[in-house]
Amino acid sequence: MVIIMVFGNIGQDKSIEILKIPKDRVGVLIGKKGNVKKTIEKELGVKLEIDADGTVTIYGTDKQKDPLAVWKARDIVRAIGRGFNPEIALKLVSDEYVLEVIDIEDYASSDNSIRRLKGRVIGKEGKSRRYIESLTGANVSVYGNTVAIVGEHEPVQIAKEAVEMLLRGASHAKTYKFLERERQKIKRARFELWKKKSDVDELYEKMNPNYEEIEIEEDEDEIEDEE
């Protein structure tokens, strides 16, 4: 279980957050010769203090350019603590990526129930987890009593809903159909966005055959010529 303590702002835009990760994930967070810790600090301009018991303290510094740097570092640490490898966790540096953590205990009534539900999410030989990942593009980690998801906003929400469907007892077939429908919606939405952009580009090219070689000017003469 991850414990997070927020100490607000200290000085100007310098926050401190303290959280705890499993002891067996401390080595992964530090990395070989401290490379993972150093990468997080360099990418976000923060400082990490990592104790052997799994307590991690994150400090904002004068080097951070992103006002959300401490929060992003917190989510990266949480993701590693929830079983993700550093390469995936570091995607959370981007504003486009988010982390969701689902507590299996919220859906279980006993230890046996927790094991059964974990098995449903993972699937035989990992099939269910891989299917969720392949249809959403998000990354899924089942670790301890949690399911964690990293990815772009919309895919993460779809993957989260699929995981919660399985935890609530929906069949794998029903869950997979849901994922297929949502994937088709995303593909259609992206196609429409691409089509609109292509239409605009094509129209502009017809209006300005050499538009890549000229500067865009919007004086009155040019507007009249275009009309």
From Swiss-Prot:
Keyword Repeat found: yes
Q: Which CDD domains match?
A: KH-I_Dim2p_like_rpt1, KH-I_Dim2p_like_rpt2
UniProt KW Ribosomal protein keyword: no
Family annotation (PROSITE patterns): KH_TYPE_1
What are the record keywords, sorted?
Answer: Repeat, RNA-binding
Gene Ontology molecular-function annotations: RNA binding
Among the Pfam families in the record, one is: KH_KRR1_2nd
Which residue intervals define the domain KH in the entry? 14-77, 106-163
Enumerate the NCBIfam families for this protein.
arCOG04150 (TIGR03665), PRK13763.1-2 (NF010327)
From the Swiss-Prot or TrEMBL record, give the protein name: KH domain-containing protein MJ0443
